[in-house]
C-alpha cells in the first residue's frame, strides 16, 4: 500500500495559511506583555506537517523575550490553529527571530563604508597624480 504524497504546492499553501492565521491570532488572542508588535515573516513546514518553523520580526520589545513568549504560547496557538485549519495534522510551532532585516542593514552599512573608503582612496590617488 503506497502512501499518498503531498504536493510541494499544498505545503506552500498551508504554510501561507498558517502565516496569515498566526498573524491574526497573535494580535487578537495572545495577551503576553512580552510580545509587542510582531510580524510573521514566513513559515516553513516539514513534509509531514509535524513541525513548523515560524520566523518573526519584532517592531517593539526585546526579540529574545518575544521569542520566549511566543514559544510559551505555542501550545495555545496550536489549539487555535487546529480550530481554523482543516488538515489532519496541525504542526508543532517553533518560533525563531528573523534577523534578515538586521543583516541587510549591516551589509548596506559595510557596502557604504567600502564605497566611501574607495572614493577617498581614489581622491588621494588623483591628488598624488596631480602633484607629480
UniProtKB/Swiss-Prot annotation:
Its main location: cytoplasm. One of its GO terms (biological process) is maturation of SSU-rRNA. It comes from the Bacteria. Keywords: Cytoplasm, Ribosome biogenesis. InterPro entries: KH_dom-like_a/b, RbfA, RbfA_dom_sf. One of its GO terms (cellular component) is cytosol. One of its GO terms (molecular function) is ribosomal small subunit binding. The keyword Cytoplasm applies. It holds the Pfam family RBFA. It is found in: Cytoplasm. Monomer. Binds 30S ribosomal subunits, but not 50S ribosomal subunits or 70S ribosomes. Belongs to the RbfA family. NCBIfam families: rbfA. One of several proteins that assist in the late maturation steps of the functional core of the 30S ribosomal subunit. Associates with free 30S ribosomal subunits (but not with 30S subunits that are part of 70S ribosomes or polysomes). Required for efficient processing of 16S rRNA. May interact with the 5'-terminal helix region of 16S rRNA. This is Ribosome-binding factor A. The gene is rbfA.
Amino acid at each position: 500500500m503506497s502512501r499518498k504524497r503531498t504536493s510541494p504546492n499544498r505545503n506552500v499553501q498551508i504554510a501561507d495559511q498558517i502565516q496569515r492565521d498566526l498573524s491574526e491570532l497573535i494580535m487578537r488572542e495572545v495577551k503576553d506583555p512580552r510580545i509587542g508588535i510582531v510580524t510573521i515573516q514566513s513559515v516553513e513546514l516539514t513534509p509531514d506537517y509535524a513541525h513548523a518553523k515560524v520566523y518573526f520580526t519584532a517592531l517593539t520589545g526585546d526579540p529574545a523575550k518575544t521569542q520566549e513568549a511566543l514559544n510559551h504560547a505555542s501550545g495555545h496557538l496550536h489549539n487555535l490553529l487546529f480550530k481554523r485549519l482543516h488538515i489532519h495534522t496541525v504542526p508543532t510551532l517553533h518560533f525563531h527571530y528573523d534577523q534578515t532585516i538586521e543583516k541587510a542593514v549591516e551589509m548596506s552599512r559595510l557596502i557604504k563604508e567600502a564605497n566611501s573608503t574607495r572614493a577617498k582612496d581614489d581622491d588621494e590617488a588623483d591628488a598624488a597624480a596631480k602633484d607629480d
